[in-house]
């Protein structure tokens, strides 16, 4: 039911194209996943999302458990029916949110007790509970519950959290019983290569349908992000999809693909879109700026998204300067389309054997310009 089929390999790098087969359709890789935390990509309908070329989205177990609750989603027919999205869905376990958003009361090998950030009530999440929530939600891919410490933690604290993550993974594997849902483990270990290697080998030993690398891009220096991207893949199985969590910049996606990663997610395209910032090649444009007031060209004349086909920079400038919701939706649509287009161009370049680690297909001098 879940299979990762490698279709082509790059001769210059570790990049590959593939197809991840799921019960709700296939995901062509490399692939960017938009983030729909509460079963919605903010400000965008499922129909609009399809127009961007999105093939898989991410929702969050932590937030959906708090509101509206997994039982209601299950009663509706599952998360796909609940949000009217018939393509694959991955649910993050909520580990990162528990440790970054909630006021912790107690943490043990059994789980985490914390205060609900919505109403202050006490909530307890264990690996077993997180698995049950995700099984009730009915996503295609469930993520194991992990302990994601702050990037400022020292090596001893990160090692302690890593052992907890590994213990929880064992419990997740024992609890997860849904044949039409894949379970992915998560590699942790912070900025320490020894711990990352240990975690990658331990997580890989379970032979799960896929494997993720977490605790990346959580405030650490870019050199530390690149160290993880460069070093962890060598300890991961080749025949499984590799998911690098929380990465959405073109530079990091290109580097990660070159090192053999396949799937990415990030809130960046919609978060920036809601603030009036649009992607153009490898730049970010603040559409509120006065220079766009009389500019009647699209954001990007080479882009085929619904926004660029129908609306000018001047119109978008007018919308965002007047805080019209439509403007934020249209820019978010373009930003998501831009990242999907980028990963599509990477795929084409890998197949044509012209992908490079500094992939920039918008440059006319690039040998991969034809993919853009």
From Swiss-Prot:
Pathway: tRNA modification; tRNA-queuosine biosynthesis. Zn(2+) binds at residues 303, 305, 308, 334. The active site is at 92 (proton acceptor), 265 (nucleophile). Residues 246-252, 270-274 are annotated as: RNA binding. It comes from the Bacteria. Substrate binds at residues 92-96, 146, 188, 215. One of its GO terms (biological process) is tRNA-guanine transglycosylation. It catalyses: 7-aminomethyl-7-carbaguanine + guanosine(34) in tRNA = 7-aminomethyl-7-carbaguanosine(34) in tRNA + guanine. Keywords: Glycosyltransferase, Metal-binding, Queuosine biosynthesis, Transferase, tRNA processing, Zinc. One of its GO terms (cellular component) is cytosol. It is an enzyme of class 2 (transferase). GO terms for molecular function: metal ion binding; tRNA-guanosine(34) queuine transglycosylase activity. Its cofactor is Zn(2+). The keyword Transferase applies. Binds 1 zinc ion per subunit. Its EC number is 2.4.2.29. Homodimer. Within each dimer, one monomer is responsible for RNA recognition and catalysis, while the other monomer binds to the replacement base PreQ1. HAMAP family: Q_tRNA_Tgt. NCBIfam families: Q_tRNA_tgt, tgt_general. Catalyzes the base-exchange of a guanine (G) residue with the queuine precursor 7-aminomethyl-7-deazaguanine (PreQ1) at position 34 (anticodon wobble position) in tRNAs with GU(N) anticodons (tRNA-Asp, -Asn, -His and -Tyr). Catalysis occurs through a double-displacement mechanism. The nucleophile active site attacks the C1' of nucleotide 34 to detach the guanine base from the RNA, forming a covalent enzyme-RNA intermediate. The proton acceptor active site deprotonates the incoming PreQ1, allowing a nucleophilic attack on the C1' of the ribose to form the product. Belongs to the queuine tRNA-ribosyltransferase family. This is Queuine tRNA-ribosyltransferase.
